[in-house]
Amino acid sequence: MISSRQDQTGAPLSSSTTTTTPVVAPISVVDHGLPYDTHNLYDVSFNNTHTIYTLLTSDPSLVDSWISTVLRDHQQRVLTVGLDIEWRPNTQRNMQNPVATLQLCVAERCLVFQILHSPSIPPSLVSFLADPNITFVGVGIQEDVEKLLEDYNLNVANVRDLRSFAAERLGDLELKRAGLKSLGLRVLGLEVAKPKRVTRSRWDNPWLTAQQVQYAAVDAFLSYEIDRRLSSYN
């Protein structure tokens, strides 16, 4: 029998490896199919408990609007943002493909910015990422922000790696080597499918498939949600 810790909602935070069968989180996506070249909207259902409202776009003005809405809605609160990136898999030696998409998630609102196909990077995004009062969270996030800096000269000022955060909160140094899938299982008690056919797909395509958007949104949402759960533990 294992001992368990609880967050402020009473949900368990296991401090050792669970022996129960993991719950596979059901995930589905609704494609709104908007008749625009600039963007599309998706509703990603996660575990039948969350709907991740997702904007896919390469339009700088829509990125402006998304950021403005987030800042307006969270102006009186500490802002934490799940961050992830995707790029076309590198298939040639000594060739590194640039970041194709930047995913940002706050609560159930997610942006999938096709930065590779954007005519410009909006100043609002530059300021948002460089704001030291905003904490961007993810697994291996330091490598992600270094790639953003190398590929687009984007500086992310304040980051928190969920591996170290989970290791500290749960008192398990092994978690410093965990991936996002492992942390989702450990912290949220949910197994999240990450099919390789999507992981290694063409993220540089001008239009992503609904499955790619679902994958991208869930990754950023998981980062946000894992951090929220760990932060609520006392």
Protein language model features and the residues they cover:
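N-terminal accessory regions of nucleic-acid-interacting proteins
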Residues: M1-L79, L162
